[in-house]
């Protein structure tokens, strides 16, 4: 009997143990990442040919202590390699692990190689050659602390390489994992199986091979035992012949069918080729179509199973489309696949929540470095009076109500950008803004006391409901997560897409960027203030400080201002402001743009203006500013500087976003200024719920 080890993906060890025992293995012992077992030569070949779950079959050769590189060399050389190698066999060494002595795996592999070669030359035998690409023998060495384990990899290449897949195509899951997913799905061979996002067809091909009793190793052309001196070719040929006989019989007797579809025509063609190479092409129908076109291929029965490894996203901006995809799949399953089973394998359990289905079972497994989950569902048969479940129903109802009221108002006002929802319901803590036919969801970061997974699932529900209520495609929904404003976070760069959208606001055309920054380039709550500035600007010299993207300057220019001066510290936003001005035909000397620290510029400027708009940050300590600024502490000093630039009879419109801001009226009076609060006049219906989003004042000489 040989002591052997079968490795597998984390989470599949018990499944592999059961498989090996069915093949005849004895003494099976599960460890993390594999199973130790015992078997004769025939069982070695049986496990290589028939295991659908093992990554490799390893024959341990020995262990040695490694306190120096000489210890490694001598420990490897102590093995009688001349009785392991066939004459003329090539070999390769795979070395993994490091310790204080062996600090480089390539160096460790070289010492092992030298020890094996020297074992031959010292006996005056021809030295074996190294072949890193396709060796006859593959020697594996694992170094764990001071112990090196030396073994012969009888698989050669990993057993997931069945021989049917075109190696040029990337596979999101290995064939061994795909086989495990099929086994855990609850699908019964002989019943229909459908994969609506099949990619290159791995799940369906593995299922078809299992169902037709086709050995996973039948199409492999190279093994790791061809140079092994103890290889028994006669037994191997018997195992191979038996596998061929069973495959022919299984295919001839199988009567059910498999269905695969994908939106990518290229991968569907690859799937067809893979299935043909696997010998089961006639059993699988592949079609080019997306999930939106999915329908039950057997509406009159029998019931079957839908299985898939749907896409998941690593980037925030991919989530709306994925949530929509999962939501659509869930609805389609309930509408068309009553009585069927569904099994999905995913690296994002939260996305599976968008199905709005309750799982009966779930399993965990590793897909490379990713922690994944497989969930199995039974789809209840629908009845005529069944009501479809609504995602985030309270939120959806409120959004629908707001949309009905605000859409009509916005159309009458001539505006395309407005707030649809602003944390109206505490449990749905987001803001939803409309920009033409786009929507932006801003999630306010939940407090640390809220369970992160529940918060993420709630956000996914919000996205699904928003897409449904607004009826927009997923690629026109932008998702952002923001904390309550903290200083300069407001202008943080988020992306590099550089995609601008032209929108209208009354008679102005403006550029917004929905993806690259935390804000979009247009503060919606200042909309009425901008319109008022336009109405006040005719024939006047207008100054816009802390101008951001210059939208107030655009309104002033369109209102007939004699000149506009736009000042901001950011070159990016000044270039944006210039684009906004040009879009509205406002260019030339009458419309100046100045890049400067606004507070420093204000103290040094000696010009006069009739109308000044200033919307400073609540607090700033930017390195590019000469000093820190606090709007509550410093607003009187700010007004003193502004008064110096204000022409007789002129007006300052002063706005800020500090909650609870208190205007120092006495301090202003000492400067000879009066302040009229106009906050309520500048709040539009879409911000009616948030009366403290800003405060706004008109300040004039007494």
Curated annotation (Swiss-Prot):
Tell me the compartments it is located in. Answer: Cytoplasm
Primary location group: cytoplasm
Which one of the record's GO molecular function terms can you name? rRNA (guanine-N7-)-methyltransferase activity
Record keywords: Cell division included?
A: no
Keyword Hydrolase: yes or no?
no
For this chain, the family text in UniProt reads: Belongs to the methyltransferase superfamily. RlmKL family.
- PANTHER family cross-referenced by the UniProt entry: RIBOSOMAL RNA LARGE SUBUNIT METHYLTRANSFERASE K/L, RIBOSOMAL RNA LARGE SUBUNIT METHYLTRANSFERASE K_L
Q: Which NCBIfam families match?
A: PRK11783.1
Q: Report the protein name in the record.
A: Ribosomal RNA large subunit methyltransferase K/L
User: What's the source species for this entry?
Assistant: Salmonella schwarzengrund (strain CVM19633)
Q: What is the lineage of its organism?
A: Bacteria, Pseudomonadati, Pseudomonadota, Gammaproteobacteria, Enterobacterales
Q: Which gene encodes it?
A: rlmL
């Amino acid at each position: 009997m040989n002591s052997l080890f079968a490795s597998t993906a984390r989470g599949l060890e018990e499944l592999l143990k059961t498989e090996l025992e069915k093949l005849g293995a004895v003494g099976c012992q599960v460890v993390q990442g594999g199973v130790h077992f015992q078997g004769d030569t025939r069982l070695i070949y049986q496990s290589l040919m028939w295991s659908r779950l093992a990554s490799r079959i390893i024959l341990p050769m020995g262990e040695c202590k490694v306190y120096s590189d000489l210890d490694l060399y001598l420990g490897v050389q102590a093995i009688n390699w001349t009785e392991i190698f066939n004459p003329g066999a090539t070999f390769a060494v795979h070395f993994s692990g490091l310790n204080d002595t062996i600090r480089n795996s390539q160096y460790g592999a070289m010492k092992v190689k030298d020890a094996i070669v020297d074992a031959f030359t010292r006996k005056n035998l021809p030295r074996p050659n190294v072949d890193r690409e396709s060796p006859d023998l593959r020697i594996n060495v694992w170094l764990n602390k001071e112990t090196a384990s030396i073994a012969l990899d009888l698989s050669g290449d990993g057993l997931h390489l069945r021989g049917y897949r075109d190696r040029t195509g990337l596979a999101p899951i290995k064939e061994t994992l795909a086989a495990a997913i099929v086994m855990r799905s609850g699908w019964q061979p002989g019943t229909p199986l459908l994969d609506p996002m099949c990619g290159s067809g791995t799940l369906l091909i593995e299922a078809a091979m299992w169902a037709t009793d086709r050995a996973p190793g039948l199409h492999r052309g190279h093994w790791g035992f061809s140079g092994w001196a103890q290889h028994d070719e006669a037994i191997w040929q018997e195992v191979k012949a038996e596998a061929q006989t069973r495959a022919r019989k299984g295919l001839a007797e199988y009567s059910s069918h498999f269905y695969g579809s994908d939106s990518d025509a290229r991968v569907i063609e690859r799937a067809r080729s893979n299935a043909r190479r696997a010998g089961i092409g006639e059993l699988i129908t592949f079609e080019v179509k997306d999930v939106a076109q999915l329908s039950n291929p057997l509406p009159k029965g029998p019931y079957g199973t839908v299985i898939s490894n749907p896409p998941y996203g690593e980037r925030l901006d991919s989530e709306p489309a994925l949530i929509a995809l999962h939501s659509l799949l869930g609805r389609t399953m309930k509408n068309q696949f009553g009585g069927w089973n569904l099994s999905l394998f995913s690296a994002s359990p939260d996305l599976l929540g968008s199905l709005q289905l309750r799982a009966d079972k779930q399993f965990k497994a590793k897909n490379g470095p990713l922690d994944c989950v497989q969930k199995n569902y039974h789809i209840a048969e629908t009845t005529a009076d069944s009501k479809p479940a609504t995602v985030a129903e309270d939120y959806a109802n409120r959004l629908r109500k707001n949309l009905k009221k605000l859409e009509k108002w916005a159309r009458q006002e001539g505006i395309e950008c407005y707030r649809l929802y602003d944390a109206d319901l505490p449990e749905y803590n987001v803001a939803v803004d409309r920009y033409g036919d786009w929507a932006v969801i801003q999630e306010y970061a939940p407090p640390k006391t809220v369970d992160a997974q529940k918060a993420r699932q709630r956000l996914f529900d919000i996205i699904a409901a928003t897409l449904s209520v607004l009826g927009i495609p997923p690629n026109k929904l932008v998702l952002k997560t923001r904390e309550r404003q903290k200083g300069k976070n407001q202008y943080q760069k988020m992306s590099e897409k550089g995609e601008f959208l032209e929108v209208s606001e009354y008679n102005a055309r403006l550029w917004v960027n929905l993806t690259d920054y935390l804000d979009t380039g247009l503060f919606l709550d200042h909309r009425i203030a901008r319109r008022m500035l336009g109405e006040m600007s005719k024939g006047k010299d207008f100054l816009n400080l802390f101008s951001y993207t210059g939208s107030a300057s655009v309104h002033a220019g369109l209102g007939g201002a004699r000149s506009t001066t736009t000042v901001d510290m950011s070159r990016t936003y000044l270039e944006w402001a210039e684009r906004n001005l040009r879009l509205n035909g406002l260019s030339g000397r009458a419309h100046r743009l100045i890049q400067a620290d606004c507070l420093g510029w204000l103290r040094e400027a000696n010009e006069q203006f009739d109308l000044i708009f200033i919307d400073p940050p609540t607090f700033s300590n930017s390195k590019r500013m000469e000093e820190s600024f606090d709007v509550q502490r410093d607003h009187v000093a700010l007004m003193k500087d502004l008064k110096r630039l204000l022409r007789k009879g002129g007006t300052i419109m002063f706005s800020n976003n500090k909650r609870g801001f208190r205007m120092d009226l006495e301090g202003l009076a000492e400067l000879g200024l009066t302040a009229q609060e106009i906050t309520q006049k500048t709040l539009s219906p879409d911000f009616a719920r948030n009366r403290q989003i800003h405060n706004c004042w008109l300040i004039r000489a007494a």
